[in-house]
Design a protein with these regions (language model features):
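Short, solvent-exposed beta-strand edge segments and adjacent coil->beta transition regions
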Residues: 8-12, 66-70
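Vicinal oxygen chelate
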Residues: 1-6, 36, 47, 59, ...
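A short beta-turn/loop motif at secondary-structure boundaries
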Residues: 41-44, 65, 99-100
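Short hydrophobic/aromatic beta-strand micro-patches
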Residues: 14-16, 72-76
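Short amphipathic alpha-helices within nucleic acid-binding modules
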Residues: 25-26, 79-84
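Core segments of cupin and vicinal oxygen chelate
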Residues: 3-8, 14-57
Length: 125
């Protein structure tokens, strides 16, 4: 069985964060992201970045305070991803839990305030 529902992509958000560099570091450590692009403002501050996670790209914009977004991401092993995210500096929102909706899901909050919901499909809905 696939680790995600047929036709789903892993992730496709645009996040506004206070610190693009810190978010990219977290995405690499927690989810194995690969940096794709980084654009700067005329004063040299980061303006926009892109990173690939699995089969998808997450885009980041730098904005003071960020937006506190929530992102759902399908992963092959939610327990391993949860552990990697905590090791990368995230705080736990929810330990991996099967709530009967077909997914095993955990929740972590990164240093920029984004809450990530890594999930692995347990059964076809």
């Amino acid at each position: 069985m696939a680790y995600k529902p047929e036709g789903y992509t892993d992730i496709s958000p645009y996040l506004l964060v206070a610190d693009i560099a810190a978010t990219l570091d977290f995405l690499e450590a927690a989810f194995g992201a690969t940096r794709l692009r980084l654009h700067h403002r005329p004063n040299g501050d980061p303006m926009h970045a892109e990173a690939r996670i699995g089969d998808s790209v997450v885009m980041l914009g730098q904005a003071p305070g960020g937006d506190g977004a929530h992102v759902h991401i399908y992963v092959p092993d939610v327990r391993a991803t949860y552990a990697a995210a905590l090791k990368a500096g995230a705080t736990s929102v929810q330990e991996p839990l099967d709530q009967g909706d077909g997914d095993l899901r955990a929740g972590v909050q990164d240093s920029q305030g984004t809450i990530w919901w890594p999930s692995t499909q347990l059964s076809v809905r």
